[in-house]
């Protein structure tokens, strides 16, 4: 049995080593004959000698290709000839491959990146883990005790525990008297003893839990320190463990033994909320182990008892690790056999990598050349690519019995229907596109279904249908009318109670449609109705003199005039058509004056007289046509009331009378009423007619309708939203009793798919199935068969239309075919065997086979320049704000929202010059993203959160290169700023404009003044001049030129030799507005000879003040200090701001007179500093007061300035933007003053600046970078941010030796990369200059690092990378030229983010087209299968991953937000699958909620619809606002977060609705819930963000099965029918695509998608999505949930489950639950200083830390929640601190937040609410009141 392989080098040549176990003995075999090679494809074979002559260098040795052999291979199914280039040593390949690829004769090189030892296994056909050897397993674990903040490996190892099949023991160097503890003298001896045990026991497999990243690296570190050689391996040459970097973590290899780290395997295999050893042990094996709290660790060294607890804890860790290892190792061994690589590699690989290694091995066997991995550009393209998703069926909720788990309705031809325009016809004669009479009136036929049927038909009142056809039945009680769909066959059983829905107008409507009059009669009626509404007949007699006859005559003029709206284009076309058809003329069409109306006129007498006659006899015309014309012109569809309304004035009551008579003749119900009002002293009346009820609307739509499509659509919408809840006999519907019989029938049966009008509030969840490997095989889906030319046979994928050649087996399908066959054979063996061990091993094997077959985040700080002002913003909030404010300008491009901007600039890096630049931001960008995100932390404390496809910058060979988020790892070097460029200028503060942003109450007593001298009458004169310029003054004032000269100085006008020219009209308009306010509000103050105006009177116009004028004004309080309006920012003002931001205070308080007093105080203990503060303050604000430790500036203007510029509290203080606009001396002055207040010299000789504000900490770093200070570190301690500076500043030199930070060093790896030789350590810039100047370094290469010495960037090293899942928006800026910007905590340069993960983007055999095709076929076959089993075998499918929806949705199309019915998105049928129709959408997004409850936009790739065949409920929000949803549709309720609930489960709960302005959501409780009758379409959309990915050409998804039952049938019948169905459906499914019978379950319930539980015939419970293990759940919650599951599934008693919950709730409320069941265990996952949010466990941990108790990451805090008020975190104590005499736990918390949430996710499926589960009827004002009842 091969355990592993590697290679060593002897005499410069590689020797393969094979680590094996044979006949129970370990051995190492050597093979010195295997040579490394790559393949090269050449344009010209004659160049091979040149290629062989190419030279490279490896460790100082010249290397070249040693041989070249021409070989025949296949590449993507095509024959190719390539050269096999053979090398002497594996390391020669990277030394030469780049040069070979660059040769002009080389097209490309292949297989150059396959590691040598792995290549050996592939080429030799060797399979690790094959054989029957029994492997010895041993697990170990260490316990350490190091202080928080200490470096890794500094603290001592306390204990080492180990476990194997024989024993579990602990080694320690403390005296502990326990039988399983071995005590040695010290830590060094303990490690030596452990090494001895490993060598004695000689395990083949050494198991750890996170041993790669903790136990082994820590052990290695301590062994090095103590001088112990860790001889853990079996390799005599290299017996010590070796640490390898693997992605963003580490991996430790022990040669000769398999180091099996469980952690990555568990993370890949099972889904848990937390992956602590305790949680995994309990979830996988159902066992628990002891927990050790932080307080006990602290007391370890104090008591022997504590040491015993630690020893037990350590021993149990080792035992749990061993037992888990035994569980998981066999599956990984099977996977290793399948893949053909070692367990060490396989167990640490992602699914994508596993598939790739498998394909590489098969490719070699088939002589197939492997494609290369994508380069950077191709990788980005793949990341941006998306494709259409799979199919899902909504689960049928509730408890079901006798469920079969399978992996993977109609009328006879003479059934009558009414077709619009035809009347009654046979259903067999209906055509697609016809309109037939449906429940909503006329409904368009989208699809006619036809099937051959032989069997029983059910006859219900003459309606014949197949047994499974559904008929709506109405039942009534005192409270509501309920409409339920019942199967036709159920009517025979007598169980159906109620009435069926009919229409008494069936014959009448049919007659109308059949006996419609001629077109002429219809046109006459429509014209008459139009003129009745908005037309006029005008006759005018005019007297004139007829000169030819010499006498007076009378001229009779006739005119017909119709007025319509300019936008009523369809009505205009109809009127013109009518005049043409009836009279053969085209009337005149003109715009009516300046209105938006059109006037249609004709002056022909004959036409006039004919129309006059029509109007006289209007009541005898064809009533529907008259009404259609009248209502088109005079009626509106009221969208609020969902009614049709006609309104006529006082003198037109007769028109309403005519309309009413016509409606009566058709039987259309209506209401009439009058509205009286007074206008111009005259009483007037409005006469109103309204069609209100659903029956009236449907009759109007059916018999009359509108002319225009817009009004018809509005009417359809009104019908859709009208109520069906109180269904009773009315003008359209009739409730009838029924009679039923049955008869035999053989022939064709038909069904219709109609357009309907359901709506749905955005919660589209699409999950997916993975029968896809079979599809790949069946349809030969592979990159080498895609669109292959010259084939005879193709399979074409539905929906997407890609063609796949069937003439030869594709590479991937042929491999998958073998895998599928292999798995099927294994599963057959599993079913046949009764040996439990063999069954388990076979299961491991089939699971291994199945595994194969199958930008910037929002809270990052961003410095930008907006409208000329430097601002620090959170990137997400900033971009969201802009996109919200400019919605109409947002474009959507490839799932990305883009907003082009022109007033924003970013701080950017020129990658060529390495200089900081300020660059224009071209666009703001945001993407929707779901996937991995990375928190990257640098040694300097800088942090940034980025997506996997977002890039930072690093240095490679002296050049700036991008490094992706997923590639960043600990130790990498990242570029950060050394110097940031600013727009330095003379900075001034316009005080009036600055304080104009404050509330009016803050500036109520502020005035502005200007001296009278020289300004007498100036303001009035200027206003008159301005009015004259604007043409509003008839006479020019005498002193006009004086004002004109002034306006020229201000730049508004230009004087010409004669006259003037206005150069800035807009500016002049604003200037005039200012002067209008000044003239109106200016007052003369004689005491001071000044003009005065109250600031608030001109506040909204102060921005119009020209600076030249403003310089002559002062601003201040009426009786207090006033200062110049324009304040020049010099070094002194910079110091004032620095003093204030660091240790200043600004406050306002009531004084003794009842008014307000304002002051700004600057604090310091140093008298010299106080003196400087005083001098500066008096310079700007006049007299001040000096106290013992502060300078008090009692001036309101100082307060307003400080508040506006810097903020007033320590937490919101900020550096004002004006500092960043100022010159460098001003910035230094600010920094110096800030350092005086909040700076000090740290004991480590570093300078330190402190602040409580995260914003201010980032601003300080930015300020320092702007001054060229780069040796910076950022820390966070006790709520305070610390910015450490490790270099001298101009105002402070410590003259002491300091450790150099990374930004002031050149890392040795950079030096080695540039100079090609070893460097012992990093070197300082000074040392580098010294070496360069002395000639010790190559001057040419020195220039490559010039940017570090003289550029604007430095390097910082990655300290930590933490990966997590993220869903939501990610953000970008498009920056002109550079496409990068400064961002993140502490600020670093970042590039654009590319996101999205559809397919495995680094795959060699990647193909988007294959992915889309496989998914399309998947949808097709799943829907077909479900349709067949339901309709032909009578099953009810309970769960198969699906989605329905039926509400109005809010969409964004092409960047524009719209409120539309979902049906309006369905514009065409792009493809059909079964009875479902699909319309592909472009640039459409739906509004939905993310997991954080935030409104976000998600892409909608398609909309789907099908006929509703289930109950529909109407949920009333208000009396007029409701939503209709199907019975199994999920709504989202706000309860302990966001939860799914069905319509009948939401009573008493809050739904989530959008605010009117879409600014957020609000919570609303439904008014009523009622069942309605509905027979239209239901619609579905996919919302992007589903879990799917394409890995190396193979689609990996979840379940490919579904659960089904036949209600009421016996188990044996169901099993039999299920197997019959399998035989039937598999004969219809192609190729390998077969459905399997996976099992039978006695009982099960289905809560929601991916959430169900079933129990099999052996009593085994299987759950999905109903986790009973959660980190922050107490034992009582987990125990209660488990009991509820057993009661429902094992005992078939939901009632018992409810009683269990009630009993537990009562026991908790009465304090009868043992304390240990209430303990909540939570883990500390990071340093306490990093926690921003303080949860209960963090609160306790911080209390322990305050007592001197050390709490490290990984510590479990076990706590109890106490009764009381206030935050939970203030009411928690450790279990050990609980005193029953003093403390009471909080029953309310444990009931509401623990037990009920744990069980409600199950019991809600059965209609139970929270209130139903309490042992008392309700809870009024808290638990105390409840208990006292």
Swiss-Prot record:
PROSITE patterns linked: INTEIN_C_TER, INTEIN_ENDONUCLEASE, INTEIN_N_TER
Query: What Enzyme Commission number(s) does the record list for this chain?
Result: 2.7.7.7
Q: Note the superkingdom of the native organism.
A: Archaea
Concerning PTM, the database record says: This protein undergoes a protein self splicing that involves a post-translational excision of the three intervening regions (inteins) followed by peptide ligation.
Which keywords does this Swiss-Prot/TrEMBL entry list? Answer: Autocatalytic cleavage, DNA replication, DNA-binding, DNA-directed DNA polymerase, Endonuclease, Hydrolase, Nuclease, Nucleotidyltransferase, Protein splicing, Repeat, Transferase
Protein family according to the UniProt entry? Belongs to the DNA polymerase type-B family.
**Protein name in the entry:** DNA polymerase
- In its UniProt entry, the species of origin is given as Thermococcus aggregans
């Amino acid at each position: 049995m091969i355990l592993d392989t590697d290679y060593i080098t002897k005499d410069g040549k590689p020797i393969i080593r094979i680590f094996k176990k044979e006949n129970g003995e370990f051995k190492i075999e050597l093979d010195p004959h295997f040579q490394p090679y790559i393949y090269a494809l050449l344009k010209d074979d004659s160049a091979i000698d040149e290629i062989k002559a190419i030279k490279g260098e490896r460790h100082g040795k010249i290397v070249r290709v040693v041989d070249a052999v021409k070989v025949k291979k296949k590449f993507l199914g095509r024959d190719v000839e390539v050269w096999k280039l053979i090398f002497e040593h594996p390391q020669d390949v990277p030394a030469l491959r780049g040069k070979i690829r660059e040769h002009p004769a080389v097209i490309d090189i292949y297989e150059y990146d396959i590691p040598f030892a792995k290549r050996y296994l592939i080429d030799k056909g060797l399979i690790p883990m094959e054989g029957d050897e029994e492997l010895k397993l041993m697990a170990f674990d260490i316990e350490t005790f190091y202080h928080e903040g200490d470096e890794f490996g500094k603290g001592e190892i306390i204990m080492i525990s180990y476990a194997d099949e024989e024993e579990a023991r602990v080694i320690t160097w403390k005296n502990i008297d326990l039988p399983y503890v071995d005590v040695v003298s010290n830590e060094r001896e303990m490690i030596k003893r452990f090494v001895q045990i490993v060598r004695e026991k000689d395990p083949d497999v050494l198991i750890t839990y996170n041993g790669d990243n903790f136990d082994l690296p820590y052990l290695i570190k301590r062994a090095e320190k103590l001088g112990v050689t860790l001889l853990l391996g079996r390799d005599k040459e290299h017996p010590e463990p070796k640490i390898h970097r693997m992605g963003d973590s580490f991996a430790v290899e022990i040669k000769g033994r398999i180091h099996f780290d469980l952690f990555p395997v568990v993370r890949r295999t099972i889904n848990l909320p937390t992956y602590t050893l305790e949680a995994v042990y309990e979830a996988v094996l159902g066992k628990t182990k002891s927990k050790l709290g932080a307080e006990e660790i602290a007391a370890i060294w104090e008591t022997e008892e504590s040491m015993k607890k630690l020893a037990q804890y350590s021993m149990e860790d080792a035992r749990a690790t061993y037992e888990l290892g035994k569980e998981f190792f066999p599956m990984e061994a099977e996977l290793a056999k399948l893949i053909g690589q070692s367990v060490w590699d396989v167990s640490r690989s992602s699914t994508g990598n596993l598939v790739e290694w498998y394909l590489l091995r098969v490719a070699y066997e088939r002589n197939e050349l492997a494609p290369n991995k994508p380069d950077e550009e191709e990788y980005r393209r793949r990341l941006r690519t998306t494709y259409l998703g799979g199919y899902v069926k909504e689960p049928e909720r509730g408890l079901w019995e006798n469920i079969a788990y399978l992996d993977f309705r109609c009328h006879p031809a003479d059934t009558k229907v009414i077709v619009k325009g035809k009347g009654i016809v046979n259903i067999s004669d209906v055509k697609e596109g016809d309109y037939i009479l449906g429940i909503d009136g006329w409904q368009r036929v989208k699809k006619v279904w036809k099937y051959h049927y032989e069997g029983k038909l059910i006859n219900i009142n003459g309606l014949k249908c197949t047994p499974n056809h559904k008929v709506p039945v109405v039942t009534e009680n005192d409270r509501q009318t309920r409409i339920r769909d019942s199967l036709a066959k159920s009517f025979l059983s007598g169980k159906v109670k109620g009435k069926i829905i009919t229409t008494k107008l069936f014959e009448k409507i049919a007659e109308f449609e059949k006996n419609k009059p001629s077109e002429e009669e219809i046109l006459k009626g429509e014209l008459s109705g139009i003129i009745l509404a908005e037309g006029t007949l005008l006759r005018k007699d005019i007297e004139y003199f007829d000169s030819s006859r010499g006498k007076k005559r009378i001229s009779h003029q006739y005119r017909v005039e119709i007025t319509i709206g300019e936008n009523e284009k369809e009505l205009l076309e109809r009127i013109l058509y009518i005049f043409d058809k009836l009279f053969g003329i085209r009337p005149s069409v003109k715009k009516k004056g300046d209105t938006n109306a059109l006037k249609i006129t004709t002056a022909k007498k004959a036409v006039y007289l004919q129309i006059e006659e029509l109007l006289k006899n209007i009541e005898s015309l064809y009533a529907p046509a008259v009404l259609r014309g009248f209502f088109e012109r005079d009626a509106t569809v009221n969208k609020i009331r969902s009614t049709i309304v006609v309104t006529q004035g006082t003198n037109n009551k007769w028109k309403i009378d005519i309309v009413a008579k016509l409606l009566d003749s058709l039987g259309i119900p209506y209401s009439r009423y009058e509205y009286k009002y007074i206008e111009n002293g005259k009483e007037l009346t409005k006469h109103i007619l309204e069609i209100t009820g659903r029956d009236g609307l449907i009759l109007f739509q059916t018999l009359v309708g509108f002319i225009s499509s817009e009004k018809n659509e509005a009417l359809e919408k009104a019908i859709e939203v009208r109520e069906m809840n109180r269904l009773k006999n009315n003008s359209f519907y009739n409730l009838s009793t029924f009679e039923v019989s049955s008869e035999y029938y053989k022939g064709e049966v038909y069904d219709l798919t109609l357009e309907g009008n359901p709506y749905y509030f955005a919660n589209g969840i699409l999950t997916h199935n993975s029968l896809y490997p079979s599809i790949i095989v069946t349809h030969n889906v592979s990159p080498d068969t895609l669109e292959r030319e010259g084939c005879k046979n193709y399979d074409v994928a539905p929906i997407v239309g890609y063609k796949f050649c069937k003439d030869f087996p594709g590479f991937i399908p042929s491999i998958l075919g073998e895998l599928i066959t292999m798995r099927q054979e294994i599963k057959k063996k599993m079913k046949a065997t009764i040996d439990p061990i063999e069954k388990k091993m076979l299961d491991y094997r089939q699971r291994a086979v199945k595994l194969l077959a199958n930008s910037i985040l929002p809270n990052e700080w961003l410095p930008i320049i907006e409208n000329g002002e430097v601002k620090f913003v959170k990137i997400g909030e900033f971009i969201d704000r802009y996109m919200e404010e400019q919605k109409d300008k947002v474009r959507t491009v490839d799932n990305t929202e883009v907003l082009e901007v022109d007033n924003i600039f970013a701080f950017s890096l020129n990658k060529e010059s390495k200089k900081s630049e300020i660059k224009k931001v071209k666009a703001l960008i945001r993407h929707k993203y779901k996937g991995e995100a990375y928190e990257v932390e640098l040694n300097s404390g800088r942090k940034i959160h980025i997506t996997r496809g977002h890039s930072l910058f690093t240095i490679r060979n002296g050049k700036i290169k991008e490094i992706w988020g997923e590639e960043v790892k600990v130790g990498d070097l990242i570029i950060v700023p050394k110097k940031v460029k600013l727009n330095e200028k003379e900075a001034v503060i316009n005080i009036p404009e600055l304080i104009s942003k404050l509330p009016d109450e803050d500036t109520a007593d502020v005035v502005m003044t200007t001296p009278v001298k020289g300004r007498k009458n100036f303001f009035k004169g200027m206003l008159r001049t301005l009015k004259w310029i604007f043409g509003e003054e008839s006479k020019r004032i005498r002193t006009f030129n004086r004002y004109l000269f002034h306006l020229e100085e201000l730049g508004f006008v230009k004087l010409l030799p004669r006259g003037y020219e206005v150069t800035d009209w807009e500016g002049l308009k604003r200037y005039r507005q200012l002067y209008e306010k000044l003239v109106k509000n200016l007052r003369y103050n004689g005491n001071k000879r000044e003009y005065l105006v109250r600031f608030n009177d001109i506040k909204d116009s102060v921005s119009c003040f020209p600076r030249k004028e403003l310089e002559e004004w002062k601003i201040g309080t009426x009786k207090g200090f006033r200062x110049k309006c324009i304040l020049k920012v010099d070094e002194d003002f910079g110091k004032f701001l620095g003093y204030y931001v660091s240790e200043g205070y600004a406050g306002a308080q009531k004084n003794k007179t009842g008014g307000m007093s304002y002051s700004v105080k600057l604090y310091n203990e140093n008298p010299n500093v106080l003196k400087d503060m005083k001098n500066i303050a008096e310079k700007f604000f006049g007299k001040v007061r000096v106290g013992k430790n502060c300078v008090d500036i009692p001036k309101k203007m100082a307060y307003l300035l400080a508040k506006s510029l810097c903020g007033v509290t320590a937490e919101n203080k900020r550096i004002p933007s004006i500092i960043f606009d100022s010159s460098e001396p001003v910035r230094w002055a600010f920094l110096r003053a800030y350092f005086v207040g909040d700076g000090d010299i740290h004991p480590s000789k570093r300078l330190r600046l402190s602040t409580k504000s995260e914003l201010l900490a980032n601003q300080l770093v930015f300020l320092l970078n702007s001054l060229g200070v780069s040796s910076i570190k950022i820390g966070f301690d006790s709520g305070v941010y610390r910015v450490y500076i490790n270099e001298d500043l101009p105002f402070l030199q410590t003259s002491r030796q300091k450790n150099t930070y990374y930004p002031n060093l050149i890392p040795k790896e950079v030096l080695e990369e540039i100079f090609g030789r070893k460097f012992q350590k990093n070197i300082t810039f000074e040392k580098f200059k010294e070496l360069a100047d002395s000639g010790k370094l190559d001057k040419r290469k020195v220039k490559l690092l010039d940017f570090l010495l003289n550029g604007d960037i430095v390097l910082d090293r990655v300290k930590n990378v933490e990966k997590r899942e993220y869903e939501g928006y990610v953000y970008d800026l498009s920056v002109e030229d550079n496409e990068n910007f400064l961002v993140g905590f502490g600020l670093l340069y970042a590039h654009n983010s590319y996101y999205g993960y559809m397919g495995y983007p680094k795959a060699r055999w990647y193909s988007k087209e294959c992915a889309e095709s496989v998914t399309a076929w998947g949808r097709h076959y799943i829907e077909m299968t479900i349709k067949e089993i339901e309709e032909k075998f009578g099953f009810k499918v309970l769960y198969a991953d699906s989605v329905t929806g039926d509400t109005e949705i809010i969409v964004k199309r092409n960047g524009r937000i719209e409120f539309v019915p979902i049906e309006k998105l369905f514009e065409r049928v792009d493809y059909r699958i079964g009875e479902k129709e699909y319309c592909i959408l472009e640039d459409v997004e739906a509004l939905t909620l993310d997991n954080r409850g935030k409104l976000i936009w998600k892409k909608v790739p398609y909309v789907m619809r099908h006929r509703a065949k289930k109950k529909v409920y109407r949920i009333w929000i208000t009396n007029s606002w409701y939503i209709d949803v199907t019975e199994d549709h999920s709504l989202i309720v706000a309860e302990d977060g966001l939860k799914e609930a069905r319509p009948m489960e939401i009573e008493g709960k809050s739904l989530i609705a959008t605010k009117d302005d879409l600014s957020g959501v609000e919570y609303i409780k439904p008014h009523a819930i009622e069942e309605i009758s509905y027979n239209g379409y239901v619609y579905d959309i996919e919302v992007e963000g589903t879990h799917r990915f394409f890995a190396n050409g193979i689609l990996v998804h979840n379940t490919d099965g579904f659960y089904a039952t036949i209600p009421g049938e016996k188990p044996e019948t169901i099993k039999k029918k299920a197997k019959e169905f399998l035989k039937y459906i598999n004969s219809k499914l192609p190729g390998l695509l077969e459905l399997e019978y996976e099992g039978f379950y006695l009982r099960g319930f289905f809560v929601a998608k991916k959430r169900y539980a079933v129990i099999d015939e052996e009593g085994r419970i299987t759950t999905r999505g109903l986790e009973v293990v959660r980190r922050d759940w107490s034992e009582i919650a987990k125990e209660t949930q488990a009991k509820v599951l057993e009661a429902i599934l094992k005992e078939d008693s939901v009632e018992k489950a409810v009683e269990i919950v009630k009993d537990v709730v009562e026991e908790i409320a009465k304090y009868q639950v043992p304390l240990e069941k209430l303990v909540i265990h939570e883990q500390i996952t990071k340093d306490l200083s990093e926690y921003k949010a303080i949860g209960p466990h963090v609160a306790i941990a911080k209390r322990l830390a305050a007592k001197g108790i050390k709490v490290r990451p990984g510590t479990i805090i076990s706590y109890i929640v106490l009764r009381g008020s206030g935050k939970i975190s203030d009411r928690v104590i450790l279990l050990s601190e609980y005193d029953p005499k003093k403390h009471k736990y909080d029953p309310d918390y444990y009931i509401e937040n623990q037990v009920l949430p744990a069980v409600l996710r199950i019991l809600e499926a059965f209609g139970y609410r929270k209130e139903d589960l309490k042992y008392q009827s309700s809870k009024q004002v808290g638990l105390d009141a409840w208990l006292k009842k």
